[in-house]
């Protein structure tokens, strides 16, 4: 068997999570058009008869304005260490800017084999010129690929090239395991994804979701109590909505998706609470939203 570790890096909203979902063949990571959707380092496992590839999704590398952002960037940088391959994912519609220049420097420092992946080519025309520009600025790529998750272009070719790079090794995870996070983390992420779907402006960035309780009840019902944290009372009002309608929408869509992954009926009990300026409080970031193990 050939097995190994692959880290995806890029600016926020470059499509890293969508690429991993395409590799795995099903949705294992939340996706959103909102930047900085991914906050944690998340490992997703692809397994076939001859390969096991552990893909690490990372927060987008950006210029942070809160302590949360600082930790997210630190997580992304550390995820490039000790892996077999790095995929530098570039949004074809954004071009080669300061985030890409910074990531190029980090890629060079990692001294790890790196593929350049120009993603979202269905939305841009000059993506081949963009690739040439990046290669001329950062001559550290062993291969260049052009992909579109929406049109399923270049995905299989990229996956095959990744397989070819994997060294001989053991099966690190059970063959039916798709993600290295507990079900409570996955549920919290699903709820946060629905908040991102229904809200705009500053709300997506100030939301954290914590699963407080999970317990099996009669008739195989899974009871889940979760809290959506925001920073201000005005944000709390937006998420609850008029007559509670926004929270009901978030809860309904979340429950349907949670039921699909746990295989049973779910009672989802959602609450919204205010934790002022939580994005600048280290204890909350490290312990309550689970970044402590990722940066040590």
Curated annotation (Swiss-Prot):
One of its GO terms (cellular component) is plasma membrane. It comes from the Bacteria. It is a peripheral membrane protein. Residues 119-122 are annotated as: G4. Residues 2-168 form the Era-type G domain. One of its GO terms (biological process) is ribosomal small subunit assembly. Residues 57-60 are annotated as: G3. Residues 199-276 form the KH type-2 domain. InterPro entries: G_ERA_dom, GTP-bd, GTPase_Era-like, KH_dom-like_a/b, KH_dom_type_2, KH_sf_prok-type, P-loop_NTPase, Small_GTP-bd. It is found in: Cytoplasm; Cell inner membrane. One of its GO terms (molecular function) is small ribosomal subunit rRNA binding. Residues 36-40 are annotated as: G2. Keywords: Cell inner membrane, Cell membrane, Cytoplasm, GTP-binding, Membrane, Nucleotide-binding, Ribosome biogenesis, RNA-binding, rRNA-binding. Belongs to the TRAFAC class TrmE-Era-EngA-EngB-Septin-like GTPase superfamily. Era GTPase family. Monomer. This is GTPase Era.
